[in-house]
Every structure is written in structure tokens, then in C-alpha cells.
Design a protein with these regions (language model features):
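Structural preference for solvent-exposed beta-strand-turn elements
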Residues: 1-180
Length: 180
């Protein structure tokens, strides 16, 4: 699995417990890896690599990604992800020559009210993963409410997040200092 390999290259400890069953421990993440040519190549071959940006932004104040490749099932926008991060206080940058996206924040992200222009499942998930560690309250209107997102929110709550509205298109997140 390319995403598991990518996480391992970032320094995440990975334990395979059985078929399709893994444990991940991300206590020593090498954020500098995000700026390497190896990451640009690896991340660019996987559409799902966008999903690491929100958690990295929340924990380390930065998240970078090459233009995602992978499957070719039509056009899927990234702007919902980045607009959500900007609403939380991040600054966006794009390096045209490398097709490399980045978001950065000084200090913690700040909770915000936001209306998503599309109910993107991955966009909502990425914003939720960033907002759980933001300072204050984040309210997401027009949030996706698919089962995948409900499972993610329930898992985050079991780790100490404070998310309400799970399963609806209005999600409220009270930011916490850390997850366990």
C-alpha cells in the first residue's frame, strides 16, 4: 500500500497485526522528508497523499504535497481542502514549477465558521483532522456525512477529540490540545 509506505518514510512506526489490520504510532515524524525529491515522487503517485496534509498542519504547523496523481477517475478538486485550512488560519502557497502545494501556520490553527462549497468527503475529513487540534470552536456547514467520515469522527472522539453533529452536514469541533 503506497500510503502506508509514505507514512513509514515520514517516520511513522507501522505494525501489521493481521490482514488489513495495522497499528500506527506517529511520535517521531520527519517533517523535513516532505521537502525531498523522494516525497515529491512518492506523494505525486498517490491521490490519497492529500490526506496527510491536515494532520501534519495541525501537529507541526505545515503540510506539503505534490500535485496528486494516482487513479484517473475524473477531476477531483483540492480547493475545498486548502480553503478549509485557510479558514483555520493557515497560509497557502503553490510552487508552479514543481506543482507543489503547501500550507503553513505560526502557532496553532484557530477555530472558524466555514461553509464548504462542496460536500467533499476527503475535504471534510482533512479539515476535521486539522480542526480537532485548533484553538477554539470550528463549525463546518455543508460537511460530508458519509459512513467513512462518521467512522473517522468517532475514532477521533475516542482519542479525545470533541466532535458533535456526526452523521449530519453540520459538524462542530471543539479543539483540544492533543489526542491520545
Amino acid at each position: 500500500n503506497k500510503l502506508i509506505t509514505l507514512l513509514g518514510n515520514l517516520g511513522v512506526k507501522i505494525q501489521k497485526n493481521g490482514p488489513g489490520d495495522y497499528t500506527f504510532q506517529a511520535d517521531e515524524v520527519n517533517v523535513d522528508y516532505l521537502k525531498t525529491e523522494a516525497f515529491k515522487k512518492e506523494g505525486g503517485s498517490l491521490r490519497g497523499s492529500i490526506m496527510i496534509v491536515g494532520p501534519l498542519l495541525a501537529r507541526f504547523g505545515c503540510g506539503y504535497i505534490p500535485k496528486p496523481g494516482g487513479d484517473k477517475i475524473g477531476r477531483r478538486r483540492l480547493d475545498t481542502h486548502f480553503e478549509g485550512f485557510i479558514n483555520l488560519g493557515a497560509k497557502f502557497r503553490y510552487e508552479r514549477e514543481d506543482h507543489f502545494y503547501g500550507v503553513e501556520v505560526e502557532g496553532r490553527l484557530k477555530g472558524a465558521y466555514m461553509l464548504l462549497d462542496e460536500a467533499s468527503v476527503t475535504g471534510t475529513a482533512n479539515i476535521v483532522m486539522a480542526a480537532v487540534l485548533a484553538e477554539g470552536i470550528t463549525t463546518i456547514y455543508n460537511a460530508a456525512c458519509e459512513p467513512y467520515l462518521q467512522q473517522l469522527c468517532k475514532m477521533l472522539n475516542s482519542m479525545g477529540a470533541k466532535i458533535t453533529g456526526i452523521g449530519s452536514n453540520l459538524i462542530t469541533i471543539e479543539g483540544v490540545e492533543s489526542l491520545g
